[in-house]
A protein has these predicted regions:
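Alpha-helical transmembrane segments and their helix-start/interface "positive-inside/aromatic belt" motifs
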Residues: 32-44, 164-174, 370-373, 450-458
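Hydrophobic alpha-helical membrane-insertion segments
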Residues: 41-56, 173-182, 383, 419, ...
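Hydrophobic alpha-helical transmembrane segments
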Residues: 78-94, 206-222, 411-418, 497-505
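Hydrophobic transmembrane alpha-helices and their helix-loop junctions in integral membrane proteins
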Residues: 100-106, 125-137, 148-428
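Short phosphate-coordinating micro-motif centered on Lys-Gly-acidic
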Residues: 144
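Cytoplasmic/organellar membrane-interface segments at the starts of transmembrane helices
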Residues: 370-372, 425-505
Length: 505
């Protein structure tokens, strides 16, 4: 038990900052300036508190740490918070990217700045809460609550088709979550509790396992997203403001992968084995199909959005391989993708702020005017295609290695996606960066400024650091991943399940 509620502080501190901004009064320009600074300092302090959690975290233990548990609703539903080696990396990723998003919005958002900053701070609270919640109802409230601020961020501050994109995002994700709510009610009736730790120990009948697995899968597959329920993502990315795209790709998508790790494998192990061939098939289709679609895009954001779907295919493949390397690789891939995809969307935002277009054909030869930008964009592009020495390689390699132990045909097909990712990533870089600076509109384009350098530098450093030294991320999650696998196979053995079901795919 933590001596003080550090997870609650980490979770709700952004909400306190949002309240301060809400109560601001004065002239419009003064309120705008103060709202930006309060949001920035709030996210920086939240990051500092989360780093204290990381510093005090014991990676040698698979138990949940910094646990807070208080009675809440109906005697059985509790306010229960805690982190383990699986959830903590996502908490740190969230708190680390939020100050960057605030800085990225510093000059680009001029309309309703106060409301914009409030939306982002509320969203941070809901995202951190999702990764810390240890009660199913509490998790559901945080998980679903995140829809509202993101819906507003896209719908109010987005592009010309923002209303269509925001409603499509909202309806897709809400539909899947309705099924999850029905599964939660069923699980409560069966187990008599909504405590996640108790539900992990509960042995659900096979019929309930399969039905509940499908219900949770529907929600998490849309959130991740998996093929074929991915079509909301490109529209949402294209219309969202730059910082909205960063959070959408870097954090919100990861809630789906986290859900598979926290619920699908430990609570429904037999169903996870039975449905693993389905997940493998959808993952391979996502990797190959969306990579091919990315090759024909003429909008930079759409290309990166489709590449995100392909990369999440490696994540689901590794998770449901249910091997140590597969799951460790899936977690690392999500953390790496959070950094790299966020950086790519920020890179698009840099040139969009100058030229007000995302059309690939509108650019070319930027290296002649923007050498710093070209260097940073090169690092992120190489990481996106999984080049050794960058963080993108580690996750993909581990997921392929872990899945190969279960099904080598799946790995063979997925490897085609690695080749295709190199094709679309290098094509994008060549079209935008290389060549002569022939377009008159680009003649006066300026390189990265001090604020943009401050945003890009930590992302470049992390992309390279985790590529050559992945130990910090892998060590934090290693014990929890091993415990998850051990409990998973123990549950299969107790239920008479067998991993041989996977080999028949």
């Amino acid at each position: 038990m933590a001596s003080w509620p550090i997870l609650s502080v980490t979770t709700f501190l952004p909400l306190v900052g949002a309240l301060f901004i809400m109560l601001m009064k004065g002239e419009d320009e003064v309120v705008k300036r103060n709202a930006r600074w309060v949001a920035l300092w709030t996210t920086l302090i939240t990051l500092a508190v989360s780093l204290v959690v990381l510093w005090r975290f014991d990676p040698s233990s698979a138990e949940f740490q910094f646990v807070e548990k208080k009675p809440w609703l109906a005697g059985t539903i509790t306010y229960h918070m805690g982190v383990d080696g699986i959830s903590l990396p996502f908490v740190i990723l969230t708190t680390a990217l939020m100050p960057i998003c605030i800085l990225a919005s510093w000059r680009t958002i001029e309309m309703r700045v106060r409301e914009y900053m409030i939306a982002f701070l509320v969203l941070e609270t809901l995202m951190v809460g999702t990764f810390c919640a240890l009660d199913l109802v509490l998790f559901y409230l945080f998980f679903e609550g995140g829809l509202i601020p993101m819906f507003l961020i896209i719908g109010v501050w987005g592009g010309p088709r923002r209303v269509y994109a925001s409603f499509k995002f909202f309806l897709y994700t809400l539909l899947g979550s309705v099924l999850m709510l029905l599964a939660i009610v069923t699980m409560y009736n069966e187990a008599g509790t909504t405590d996640i730790l108790a539900l992990m120990r509960h042995s659900f009948p096979l019929g309930i396992q399969k039905w509940a697995w499908l219900a949770f899968f529907a929600s998490f597959a849309v959130k991740l997203p998996m093929w074929p329920v991915h079509t909301w993502l490109p529209d949402a990315h294209v219309e969202a403001p730059t910082a909205g795209s960063v959070i959408l790709a870097a954090i919100l998508l990861k809630m789906g992968g986290y859900g598979f790790l926290r619920f699908s494998l430990p609570m429904f192990p037999v169903a996870s084995v039975d449905f693993a061939p389905l997940v493998f098939a959808l993952s391979v289709i996502a990797i190959i199909y969306t990579s091919l679609v990315a090759l024909v895009q003429d909008d930079m954001k759409k290309l990166i959005a489709y590449s995100s779907v392909a990369h999440m295919g490696f994540v689901t493949m590794g998770i449901f391989a249910a091997t140590v390397q597969g799951i460790a690789g899936g977690i690392f891939q999500m953390i790496s993708h959070g950094i790299v995809s966020g950086a790519l969307f920020l890179s698009v935002g840099v040139v969009y702020d100058r030229m007000h277009t995302r059309e690939i054909a509108a650019y070319g030869g930027l290296v002649n005017r923007m050498p710093l930008y070209a260097a940073a964009f090169m690092v992120f592009t190489l990481a996106n295609l999984g080049l050794p020495g960058t963080s993108g390689f580690i996750g993909e390699f581990l997921t392929l290695l872990g899945t190969f132990k279960v099904n080598n045909w799946v790995v063979t097909l997925a490897t085609l996606g690695v080749i295709l990712s190199a094709a679309y990533a290098l094509w994008l870089y060549r079209k935008i960066i290389f060549g002569r600076l022939e377009k008159p509109s680009l003649a006066a384009i300026r390189d990265l400024g001090p604020r943009e350098i401050a945003i890009m530098t930590p992302l470049v450093v992390l992309t390279i650091l985790f590529g050559v030294y992945p130990k910090p991320v892998l060590d934090v999650s290693a014990t929890s991943v091993t415990a998850l696998i051990d409990n998973y196979h123990h549950a299969l053995g107790a239920a008479g399940g067998t991993k041989a079901a996977l080999l028949g795919f």
